[in-house]
Amino acid sequence: MSISPTQPKILKAGILPMVCLAAGLVFAAPAQAEWANLRGPNMDGAIEGVGMTAPWPDSGLERVWAKRLGTGFASTTVVGDHLYTAGFSDDEDHVYCLNVKTGEQVWQFSYPETIFDRSHEGGPASTPASDGEHVYILSRTGKFICIDAQTGEEQWRHHVVDDWGSEVPRWGYSGSPLIVDDKVLVDAGLTVAMDKKTGEVIWKSKNYGSAYNTPMVETIHGQKVVITFNGTGLTLLDYADGAELAVYPWPTNYSVNSCTPILHDNHIFFSSSYGQGGAMVKVNDDFSLDAVWETKEFNNHFNASVLHDVYLYGYHGHYGRSENALRCFDFETGEVMWEEPSISRGSVLLIDGHVVALSGNGELVLIEPNPEEFTAVSRFQALGGKCWTESAVADGMIFVRNNEAGNLFAYRLTGQG
């Protein structure tokens, strides 16, 4: 384990500017799962029990608070009353703990880092993960840090390059940590499982090349399996020891396999851009993988799709090119059902059974989950600038962010009308 040569800065509440737009006004919302990892409770972008108002008011959802974080692409996680996220400014990465109800800063943990702005704005792309006791973050250059969730004090750290021999990918590390049981996992080309309290390495997998993806842990055929999507392709590992169970090669330009796969009924969908496309494979009892279909017609570039019934809703096409658009796609057959070009280059969630898309230009859209045709139930301009970060939901609110300015907005989903 390596220790930081420099003392990180920890700032308590009130250091950065914050605007509370509805001070003291908190609506009661039904109990719902916490958003402790990237893409929510089950890492599938879906959450129930929010009590979301639908349709939304004509004027849009109520904005509760706003916070400037600095440049970056990190999303948010929420455990209890604490929200965790990250940004970059003044040659440092900053991990923030905010009060989820008000946006008030609880603490800020800062450490030296490069902006890593190759072909984009840069800043942290990894989303912090938390179990309420610890917060974990992976920086663009490979610093993997455990922070006390209550105090903001560093507990331990590794460096995935110096300690484990990983190589920084072309656009820097962007996968997020995953907490499962007493372990924390990170994919840095090789997947590493550590004791979440001490940082002791429990196992390391072989190295599969560039890593931009967040690992998943799922039970398949009665066995706990780690699913990763790395430079080699779709990879299944034994959760107990990291041993390889299966690999489905998926060569993508620049090895950018970044979107979280989707598991449904022992079938896995995965997708990448640069013209590579998407595929669905069946996981057999012996963990061999059989291709069900492959297609060039559904290219998820950065952000994964959501599954409603047997239909996927997500973004097709390279985020830097004009062809990107929201599509509905048949999970079972690989058929494109519809396309909506007015919504592009963003992220998508499934909230109380409704599709909610944030476009790359900051428009928030409530969509009827209908494979027959695109139907926007409500839409409004939630924020400006480039919005490539995945949204998150907790405490009856949706959290949306833009990238260069790093403004995080909280919008009330419940009690609207």
Task: Please give the residue ranges for each predicted region.
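Extracytoplasmic beta-rich repeat domains
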Residues: V64-T77, Q108-A129, R157-I179, K204-Q223, ...
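Structural motif
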Residues: E92-V95, Q276-V281, R321-R327, E363-I367, ...
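Bacterial N-terminal signal peptides
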Residues: G14-V26, T191
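Aromatic (tryptophan-biased) beta-strands that constitute blades/sheets of beta-rich domains
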Residues: A33-R68, H94-Y96, T102-D117, E153-S166, ...
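Short loop/turn segments immediately following the C-termini of beta-strands
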Residues: G40-M43, F88-D90, R140, G189, ...
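Short loop/turn segments that connect beta-strands within beta-propeller blades
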Residues: N99-T102, D148-T151, D195-T198, D238-G242, ...
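Short coil/turn segments that connect the beta-strands within blades of beta-propeller domains
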Residues: G80-D81, G132-E133, D181-D182, G222-K224, ...
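Residue position within the beta-strands of beta-propeller blades
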Residues: L83-T85, I137, V186, T228, ...
